[in-house]
Amino acid sequence: KELQNSYKKSNNNIELFKTWKESYELQYFKQGIFEENVNAYKILEITPTFDNLKELKEESKYHEFAKILRKHNISGKENAFDKLVNIFLCKIYDETFNKNNLKFGYFGVMADTYANMQDRLMWLYKEAMKEFLGEKITFVSNEDIEKDFKQLKIKTLKEVMQNYIKELKFYSNNDFAFLEVHNKELFLKNALVLKEIVELFANYKLTQNSTNQFLGNLFELFLQKGMKQDEGQFFTPIQICEFIMYSLPLQEMLSKNSKALRVIDYACGAGHFLNTYANELKRYLTEDELKEHYKNIYGIEKEYRLSKVSKVSSAMYGQNEINILYADALASFELANTNNLEGEKAKPQIESNSFDLLIANPPYSVKGF
């Protein structure tokens, strides 16, 4: 009502803009008028869906991302890329499993808060890590907190406990901390960065059937700097991957096997070999056949960050069925197939002597080795 009155008191375009800026933080919607499922005057009840997302074809997205980092004085590019990969994982999971009710995004000052936005991201990240990499992430949602304290009779005690949990949950470094976070003020500063980056990709599809070079460009800018020289990690250029792939009698192997070839890269890094092989399959197989072949592609990666990068990369290439296992390829298969902490079965399962093709360029340049 107060906001309605402020609009009524605005006598010209300058005052209207001031009210919009101060009350709504310049919020606007990119849908809500011409779509078939929209009811008049119900713009806040719009449910974002996958079908309303646009194809990501803008190379300028990287420059916009870099601009956000400069704007907020974020110099740690590797950390920023790690957090961006986490955001991509959230979005890919959302597009895959929540097509009719997307959770990814900031829904404006009138319908959302920074804490709720991050809470949704943390939930999506937990589900994505479980689904794509078989990793268990500890997370307590706002709904869980409300449910567990629902029966608490003393309202003051309930609020105190909820505030303690909120501080532990949000006011510390986390999987979406582009900036150092250890109090409410820093949480809000980081939330501004997170909001801008989320909004950068919220209206675009990251899962599609065509090749997307955007993530590859980010690899070049963030992954190869420092890691290659300091840790002996090399990312095989796409051109070398393609050269090796073209050297294989792939068409002959496919014609001789009635079942899909089982393929493995036991040190898959950013997933270049896996994605190049999957792209090459498109020359010989139909769209219906491809999915089954993708399910038989396996990558093992010992480095935690790169296992996530590899999964994001395969999804953005439209090859989400590729299996990525966060494990040590030099360990026994029995150990590699379990999560170290709880002994739960990891995904995917690796069986000895079960592969038809090995494509890899394992790390070899480590000082003092």
Describe the residue ranges of each PLM region.
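Non-catalytic, well-ordered alpha-helical scaffold segments
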Residues: H63, E78-I87, K195, N212, ...
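Conserved ATPase-coupling elements of RecA-like P-loop NTPase cores
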Residues: K367-F369
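A short beta-strand submotif of the Rossmann-like class I SAM-dependent methyltransferase core
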Residues: A360
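Class I SAM-dependent transferase core
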Residues: I68-L69, G216-I240, M245-Y246, L250
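Short, basic/polar, glycine-containing "phosphate-handling" surface segments that engage DNA
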Residues: K1-K83, D175-F176, E180-N183, A191-N209
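Long recognition/docking surfaces used for binding and targeting
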Residues: L89, T96-Q224
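Conserved S-adenosyl-L-methionine
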Residues: F234-K345, Q349-N353, L357, S365
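Short, hydrophobic/amphipathic alpha-helical patches that form generic packing surfaces
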Residues: K83-E95, A315-M316
